[in-house]
C-alpha cells in the first residue's frame, strides 16, 4: 500500500517542475520547500559514471565548505604520548589511546569524525567491524590519519567533510542548512562539484557526471543543471 504524502510535502512537490534548474534557482527552491518546523539540512545526491567495485573507480575524499555546514561536529582522536594533550587543547571532544579503542569496541559511537595518528593505526584496524559500516575508519585520503592533529581537528570543526561514493556510484553529502542564504549554499555546492572533479577516479570512463539533485532533508528532490554548475564562476570576495 502506497504511503500517503503529508499535505506539507504535497504542497512542496507542487512547486518543483520536472526539469533541471539553474544552480541558484534550484537552491532558492530548496529553501522554499524546506517547510518543516526545524532548520532542515541541505543535501546533495550525485550519481557518477563509476563502478566502485573496481579500485580505480572508487571515490573517497574530503571537501572544505567555505560557508561551513551549520552543524556542530563531534571529533574523536585516537593518539598517544604528547599528542593526547595537543588534541585536547585543540578542541577534540573525545581523546584517548587504548581505552578509547576499547570503548568503541563496546559500542560507544558518540562522534561524527574519528582522527588517528599513524602510530595508532595498527590498533585502530581492529575497529573495522564497528567503524567500517558507518564510514568512520580513519584514512590518509580522508585526512583523518595524520600527525598534525591540531590542523585536522580545526578543519573538521570548521566544516570539512569526508565523503565517498556508495556501491551504486552515488555520492550523498550534507552541504549546509536551509537557513543559509541561497548564495552561500551555492558557494558550498560549487566547492563540492570542484572537489569531485579534481578527484575523478583514474578508471572513470565516459560521462562522469550523470545527475545531481538537491533537497532539504524533509523536502522534495530538485534536479540541478550540472553543466551550468560546472561552468559557474564564483568570484571570491575580499
Swiss-Prot record:
InterPro entries, sorted: Ribosom_uL1_bac-type, Ribosomal_uL1, Ribosomal_uL1-like, Ribosomal_uL1/biogenesis, Ribosomal_uL1_3-a/b-sand, Ribosomal_uL1_CS
CDD domains named among the record's database cross-references: Ribosomal_L1
Keywords: Repressor, Ribonucleoprotein, Ribosomal protein, RNA-binding, rRNA-binding, Translation regulation, tRNA-binding
Gene3D superfamilies: 3.30.190.20, 3.40.50.790
GO cellular component terms listed in the entry, alphabetical order: large ribosomal subunit
An annotated GO BP: translation
Name of a matching Pfam family: Ribosomal_L1
Record has Ribosomal protein as a keyword: yes
One Gene Ontology term of the molecular function aspect: rRNA binding
Stored HAMAP family: Ribosomal_uL1_B (MF_01318_B)
Self-association and partners: Part of the 50S ribosomal subunit.
UniProt family annotation: Belongs to the universal ribosomal protein uL1 family.
Function: Binds directly to 23S rRNA. The L1 stalk is quite mobile in the ribosome, and is involved in E site tRNA release. Protein L1 is also a translational repressor protein, it controls the translation of the L11 operon by binding to its mRNA.
UniProt protein name: Large ribosomal subunit protein uL1
Phylogenetic lineage: Bacteria, Bacillati, Cyanobacteriota, Cyanophyceae, Oscillatoriophycideae
This protein's encoding gene: rplA
